[in-house]
């Protein structure tokens, strides 16, 4: 089973400067029976990166937002590769774009308050996520309860 994990674009996946999401991803990947077929995608300038990492290059572009550039470059990287699962961490607003470019199953992880994240603030946003995401995983009961608030 081939799994692509997309980190938030500001998340460092490095030994010395890893953020909370990177630490979680790295620790859970070490325990996975699929660890040899997991690729982690992100954007970092740090050179001391962790295993199975593919850097998404970003260039300053006043005509394209960093998020759009990040997602477009990710799409190019996975275009000709076969992944069974796309795992997205803490970025619900990435999901609609990823649905347009890939039929691969999508799993969304929430590490923080969903009501403060673009793409899951409104009830309509959250209903859409429930309909277009194959699975949503919450790192705590608190974040799950926040997602389910009316």
Language-model features: locations:
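Extreme N-terminal starter segment of soluble prokaryotic enzymes
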Residues: 1-3
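N-terminal strand-loop element at the rim of the active site
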Residues: 7-16, 23-66
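Short, well-ordered alpha-helix to beta-strand connector turns
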Residues: 35, 83, 103, 132-134
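Alpha-helix capping/helix-boundary segments
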Residues: 46, 92-94, 142-144
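An amphipathic, basic-hydrophobic alpha-helix
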Residues: 61-85, 95, 120-121
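Short His-centered aromatic/hydrophobic patch
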Residues: 88-94, 110
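Hydrophobic faces of well-ordered beta-strands that scaffold small-molecule active sites
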Residues: 106-108
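A short, active-site helix/loop in glycosyltransferases that binds the activated sugar's phosphate group
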Residues: 119, 126-127, 132-150
